């Protein structure tokens, strides 16, 4: 079947997870919204986790989440794949298995061929099929800027749930995918990188976090998150606050896409990075070159999992991630200690 050649990037200024609302503003506006109270709710928005969790019985809990955004790449089919992988990632980050999805679509009734929407949905369905989940329908509204994503329901055993609050002092931090997605996509739009770097970024965004989620269960991991629009620092902030620990990150151990550090040194810094640095604020104590700090704040789309694993098993976990053939960039990037003061993110 022929695919559309329409350039989706011509419709947007900000795409992917860089289009998220400023996290500081989001926290402020949600402050006075009352939280539901029920003994069966295991995870709500108070801990800034990747999804909500509701206990059905002693053996099964439901994971519910949603994510959608404007195009992050030119090709409609690829955009569908990336958006679906990004939405499914929240379930994987909680240690679960996606079960059911609904398509969430915004698309103009005029100006863009309807075949473009068909390609987006086909791309999304490819990724959904890879996850083993089932599409149960969806909802589409008329909007001048295309947007696509999923509402996802997953399942997990209540005793195997992975949350922001599960990190313990003494554990090591493992990251499964390289950083630099935001930098690479901005550089692509400016014509600053070649096809090799661009395709590497696309490949990482299309990659499901399924293998990482399965290994989290093998290693008994209970503290993790995925790295998306708030950057590694923003999502690490959620782990540190919910677990009441200090996270120490070795910036030079963090995996990074080719050329992205040199791009940052040359001033190719997406605006979302500055927004994310404001969000972490005084929690961050950084003693590293500026390009590394900006890398850690770079907004990722469909990024990797940041896991906290017992120190004596960290190298084995990384080796298992490498053996999957899907996560060659996986690396130990730091460790957790007891929190002693306001600085809960120490970067060297």
From Swiss-Prot:
<feature type="binding site" description="in other chain">
    <location>
        <position position="67"/>
    </location>
    <ligand>
        <name>ATP</name>
    </ligand>
</feature>
<dbReference type="InterPro" id="IPR004536">
    <property type="entry name" value="SPS/SelD"/>
</dbReference>
<feature type="binding site">
    <location>
        <begin position="138"/>
        <end position="140"/>
    </location>
    <ligand>
        <name>ATP</name>
    </ligand>
</feature>
<feature type="active site">
    <location>
        <position position="17"/>
    </location>
</feature>
<keyword id="KW-0808">Transferase</keyword>
<protein>
    <recommendedName>
        <fullName>Selenide, water dikinase</fullName>
        <ecNumber>2.7.9.3</ecNumber>
    </recommendedName>
</protein>
<comment type="similarity">
    <text>Belongs to the selenophosphate synthase 1 family. Class I subfamily.</text>
</comment>
<dbReference type="Pfam" id="PF00586">
    <property type="entry name" value="AIRS"/>
</dbReference>
<keyword id="KW-0418">Kinase</keyword>
<dbReference type="InterPro" id="IPR036921">
    <property type="entry name" value="PurM-like_N_sf"/>
</dbReference>
<feature type="binding site" description="in other chain">
    <location>
        <begin position="47"/>
        <end position="49"/>
    </location>
    <ligand>
        <name>ATP</name>
    </ligand>
</feature>
<feature type="binding site">
    <location>
        <position position="50"/>
    </location>
    <ligand>
        <name>Mg(2+)</name>
    </ligand>
</feature>
<dbReference type="GO" id="GO:0005737">
    <property type="term" value="C:cytoplasm"/>
</dbReference>
<dbReference type="InterPro" id="IPR016188">
    <property type="entry name" value="PurM-like_N"/>
</dbReference>
<dbReference type="GO" id="GO:0000287">
    <property type="term" value="F:magnesium ion binding"/>
</dbReference>
<keyword id="KW-0067">ATP-binding</keyword>
<comment type="function">
    <text>Synthesizes selenophosphate from selenide and ATP.</text>
</comment>
<dbReference type="GO" id="GO:0016260">
    <property type="term" value="P:selenocysteine biosynthetic process"/>
</dbReference>
<dbReference type="Pfam" id="PF02769">
    <property type="entry name" value="AIRS_C"/>
</dbReference>
<dbReference type="GO" id="GO:0005524">
    <property type="term" value="F:ATP binding"/>
</dbReference>
<keyword id="KW-0547">Nucleotide-binding</keyword>
<feature type="binding site" description="in other chain">
    <location>
        <position position="90"/>
    </location>
    <ligand>
        <name>ATP</name>
    </ligand>
</feature>
<keyword id="KW-0479">Metal-binding</keyword>
<keyword id="KW-0711">Selenium</keyword>
<comment type="subunit">
    <text>Homodimer.</text>
</comment>
<feature type="binding site">
    <location>
        <position position="90"/>
    </location>
    <ligand>
        <name>Mg(2+)</name>
    </ligand>
</feature>
<dbReference type="InterPro" id="IPR023061">
    <property type="entry name" value="SelD_I"/>
</dbReference>
<feature type="site" description="Important for catalytic activity">
    <location>
        <position position="20"/>
    </location>
</feature>
<keyword id="KW-0460">Magnesium</keyword>
<dbReference type="GO" id="GO:0004756">
    <property type="term" value="F:selenide, water dikinase activity"/>
</dbReference>
<dbReference type="InterPro" id="IPR036676">
    <property type="entry name" value="PurM-like_C_sf"/>
</dbReference>
<feature type="binding site">
    <location>
        <position position="226"/>
    </location>
    <ligand>
        <name>Mg(2+)</name>
    </ligand>
</feature>
<dbReference type="InterPro" id="IPR010918">
    <property type="entry name" value="PurM-like_C_dom"/>
</dbReference>
<feature type="binding site" description="in other chain">
    <location>
        <position position="20"/>
    </location>
    <ligand>
        <name>ATP</name>
    </ligand>
</feature>
